[in-house]
């Protein structure tokens, strides 16, 4: 038998085998499925994460709003307290001013009283000095009076002695001398009396 030759007609370059396209399609579908399988969990995770983040954000926002409200309330309270404290401070300042004024007045009054007391003490000291001087003068006067009394007593004693002597002289003259002699004796007595008076005045 003569050999048979199988002759294949050459295919154009644009034409490919039908199995190749199916493979590519399968690969594309598989890749799409894989991508979908990967993307869906990512989307779910992102949604969950976003939802939790949103919730957390809302919670944080609520907390922030609550804290801001609390802070505003505290601020208003602190402002009210500050206003009350300022009012109390103003009243305290007024009371302090009034107390200072009253204290200054009292201090001035006390100083005036002290000055008066010092003046009175000085006057009392002067009066005491005057009293002491007067007492010394009185003592001197008493001593002088006592001396005068002693002198008077001496003079009285001398006068008594003189009178006794005169009596003796009179009796003696009356007994021994006549009437003329009595007249002469009376003249002598009168002369003696005249002499005794200046002596008394001298003492």
Curated annotation (Swiss-Prot):
Glycosylation sites: 66, 93
Cytoplasmic domain ranges by topology: 1-26
First-listed, main subcellular location of the protein, grouped into a coarse class: Golgi
Protein known as: Bone marrow stromal antigen 2
Entry function: IFN-induced antiviral host restriction factor which efficiently blocks the release of diverse mammalian enveloped viruses by directly tethering nascent virions to the membranes of infected cells. Acts as a direct physical tether, holding virions to the cell membrane and linking virions to each other. The tethered virions can be internalized by endocytosis and subsequently degraded or they can remain on the cell surface. In either case, their spread as cell-free virions is restricted.
Swiss-Prot/TrEMBL GO biological process terms: defense response to virus; innate immune response; negative regulation of cell growth; negative regulation of cell migration; negative regulation of intracellular transport of viral material; negative regulation of plasmacytoid dendritic cell cytokine production; negative regulation of viral genome replication; regulation of actin cytoskeleton organization
Post-translational modification: The GPI anchor is essential for its antiviral activity.
